[in-house]
Amino acid sequence: MKTKKFLLTSIFFALFIHLFSQEEFTYQLPPKEVIEIVDAPATPSVSIGSKAGKILVIENSELPSLEELSAEELRLAGIRINPATNGMSRASFSIGLSMMDLDGKNIQPVVGLPKKPRIRNIEWSPDEKHIAFTHTSDRGIEIWILDVSTRNARKLTSMYANEALGNGLAWLSDNKTLLFKGVPEGRGERPVMNLVVNGPVVQESYGRKAAVRTFQDLLKDSKDELLFDYYATSQIFRVSLEGSAKPVGEPGVIGNFTPSPDGKYLLVNKYIKPYSYIVPYYRFPQTYEITDLEGNSVRLLAEVPVADNLPQGFDAVAKGMRSPSWQSDVASTLFWVEAIDGGDPAAKAIYRDQIFLLKAPFDGEPIPSIKLRLRYGGFIWGKNDFALISEYWRKDRNTRTYLFDPSLPDREPVLLFERSTEDRYNDPGRFQTITNSFGFNVLQFDKYGKKLFLFGQGASPEGNRPFVDVYEIITGKTTRLWRSEAPWFESPVKIMDVDKMELITRRESIEVQPNYYSRLLKSKKIKQLTFFPDPMPQLKGIQKEMINYDRADGIPLSGTLYLPKGFTPGQDAPLPTLLWAYPNEYKSADAAGQVSGSPYSFTRISASSPIILVTQGYAVFYNASFPIIGEGNKEPNDSFIQQLVANAEAAINKLVEMGVSDRDMFAASGHSYGAFMTANLLTHCDLFAAGIARSGAYNRTLTPFGFQGEERTYWQTPEVYNVMSPFMQAEKMKTPLLLLHGLVDNNSGTFPMQTERYFDALRGLGATARMVLLPNESHGYRARESVLHMHWETIQWLDKYLKGK
């Protein structure tokens, strides 16, 4: 009897340990076909120097190794710093450079590059005779220079750049001087932290509202402040082409600096104490100051307080100076914007924002300029009496573009375009710019100064058909010059000659790798310039089709269907199918039904793409439309679950009707908000046999001051937050769910804890689930080992719960 009791007890504890212990697991490899796609070389990119008559061909890097991703990383004030280089961690690099003529001939590698280049921040000089770039070595970030005519590259100075707060590399308009943010000379050693703390961390609230969204990697204590100061403090240097470097001004926590177009002044943005523990560095108190090239103060423009108490709503902005910058087409005039309505979108106001101008020598009063009825969206400067300005209102998706005369600031601007940002079919495109003699971007006119040019994606019921339009300034008439034609997907890149209407485009088709072409619009001649090879020839024969269908309430939907080689719908047995989607909120049902993507784009599968499953015998319905609509006074999320299920039903019905898919073998999947969608679908319907959720958030009460497109707080609409949270309905989960998450996810709102706690709930309630946490990975997965293992997990899960049915 004792032996039997002992045996039962042993079995119980063995089962208990098996169920609740962590699995000792190593990285796994997916099938060979998947590995080959993940390891396929990246397609080169180009940078065009029209003045130089050259094209810079840029070779891009593959996936980093887990060892690279495991390097020490400091997470401070919303940023991640590599202390070895004083730059951003997890940066992507280019690994090679070549030069070629504009006619596509004479491609030659750049000589003199370091042995293992890690290139970023490529900047042409205004005259395009030189190119500056950075190379990240093991010791720091080096400044390099490339002579365009000789193709010779060399390190410019022994000083190291400081990119903790982003790139700080800028040419002066003299074409001989480069400015950069550097590590201060004599900085000393990194602060040594005392493990014994001096006291508790204290934060207080005295009735002042400070509602902020959830941010990651914030400062936590005085030790973090010391480290932030050490790595974020930089010194501006100016360096000649001969390599002689000179400091400009004093060191500080410099966010951005920009030289004036004439190269006589600098606009310098610095962050100052006291720092905040609830917002990232870019919301810290800061100053804007004009200095000369020696660093002497010309004028302190503004001291901006910490932005931790913005009014509620996406259209809320801080009081005081915003977005100061130089007017691109004149020597040295500053402009900025200030809120007239106190930054509060709930305030009743005819005008919301106002532009101010300040001209050199900056000793006068700022000149009040144009008032905007919505929020300032940006300038495109043209010439003294001609500029374009845009405004927007996110709540109702309205955007407007105006023609504005900077020389007559009191004159009412002329409305050019007004539309909903959701309405892609009527998007007029973006006005084209060129680089002027100062090295600044300005509008590209025809030779008479009477016409402008627009490039657009050309969204249509047939998919995207990129276009080039000409806009006549006097009449306001727009005429189409060119449009991409089937069976090609061709996008305009740059107008090289407005007289000849010579255009550089990027051209591709379903099975033809993207390459760059020269196209003469008048003669309709076309010439191929680059000949990049197909990186994935093994995908030849993969079938791709854009599918259109309707939701039960009549909303048009679409998605791109990928099928394995040789599969014939209606003849072959229906396939197990992965539905991949990402919900989007709309205020217009008409806009929600618009088609996105192109049926003619090249089938290039990125390393982490779910389309890779097509090599394993699955159909993949990619980027299926999942609109969540709330017209008028209705908010989209008030019917989030119902619309989510309706979208899924429509897609499944269509694919089953086509003979592509087996109704009992569907899996739902998505990343981030798509993962949130996946968990909700599996919770609230029985349409799927499995689900795979990557890097999601599942408990919306942990993002109580808004999320995604939701402006309302948890305390205003607790029922919406609770109903939308799959964590709150974890007991309803009856479908196998694979959860993946990067252990150091820094995306706002998607803490790894979201997946950990959701899995705990599912396990505690008896659901079938598996949680995979990827070490050293952020919101997207980058290490080769992680990406391959993710695919292994996905294939194992789907083979078991779809193919195994």
Q: What do the PLM-derived regions correspond to, one by one?
A:
Residues 1-23:
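Bacterial Sec-dependent N-terminal signal peptides
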Residues 21-525, 531, 535-541, 556, ...:
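Beta-propeller folds
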Residues 77-79, 574-576, 580-615, 710-711:
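N-terminal cap/lid subdomain of alpha/beta-hydrolase-fold enzymes
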Residues 91-98, 102-104, 598-805:
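Active-site-proximal cap/loop segments of hydrolase catalytic domains
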Residues 288, 334, 416, 516, ...:
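Conserved hydrophobic/aromatic pocket- or pore-lining residues that grip, position, or stack substrates
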Residues 291-296, 360-363, 393-396, 404-411, ...:
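Secondary-structure transition/capping motifs at alpha-helix termini
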Residues 530-573:
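N-terminal cap/lid segment of alpha/beta-hydrolase-fold proteins
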